[in-house]
A protein has these predicted regions:
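Conserved GNAT-fold acetyl-CoA-binding loop/helix
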Residues: 21-48
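A short helix-loop-beta-strand connector motif used in the catalytic cores of GNAT acetyltransferases and
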Residues: 33, 46-62, 89
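A conserved beta-turn-beta hairpin within the catalytic core of GNAT-like acetyltransferases
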Residues: 69, 79-90, 100, 147-148
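Conserved beta-strand-loop-alpha-helix junction that forms the acyl-donor binding cleft
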Residues: 97-100, 122-135, 152-156
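Conserved active-site alpha-helix within GNAT-family acetyltransferase domains
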Residues: 102, 106, 110, 118, ...
Length: 156
């Protein structure tokens, strides 16, 4: 697979925002999502992640073909606020729908691992939804293991 990586530009913002918003919306547990107004949620979420999407706290990378066809993107930065050792962190990884299942996600995660290694990090982490079995399978095949689990309990 011939993949070119380049820094994201402002011209990429629209597709990155749309993809991120849809991915996160889909990951919200169903019992929470039914109570949310999509437009209000998007406005709230945009405020929360703007520094990450703008690249203020992260590096945004686009994967594309030699003909500049979008394959996916990855947003990388530093994590590790639980321990004193800084770690690489994959804030978002997204693959174009027509490229899923073709190795692009695996390529992006391996590329992100190299990115972290080159910066001296000894570990890279990410967060994935319990319901995203396909992504979890890719991450586990690349050596990622579950370390923490977020749990929720409805109070109604």
């Amino acid at each position: 697979m011939d993949v070119r990586m380049r820094r994201a530009r402002r011209a990429d913002d629209d597709v990155m925002w749309r993809a991120t918003l849809q991915t996160v919306w889909d990951d919200i547990p169903a019992d929470e999502r039914v109570r949310l107004n999509r437009d209000k949620w998007e406005a709230h979420f945009r405020k929360k992640i703007e520094p990450y999407m703008a690249g203020d706290r992260t590096e945004r990378w686009i994967a594309e073909t030699a003909d500049h066809e979008l394959l996916g993107y990855v947003i990388l930065g530093e994590g590790g606020f639980i321990t004193p050792e800084a770690q690489g962190f994959i804030y978002d990884v997204w693959v174009a729908p027509d490229r899923r299942g073709k190795g692009v996600g695996k390529f992006l995660v391996e590329w992100a691992s190299d990115w972290a290694r080159q910066r001296g990090y000894r570990k890279i982490k990410l967060e994935v939804s319990e319901t995203n079995a396909r992504a979890r399978h890719v991450y586990e095949s690349l050596g990622f293991r579950a370390e923490r689990r977020y749990m929720g309990k409805p109070l109604e």
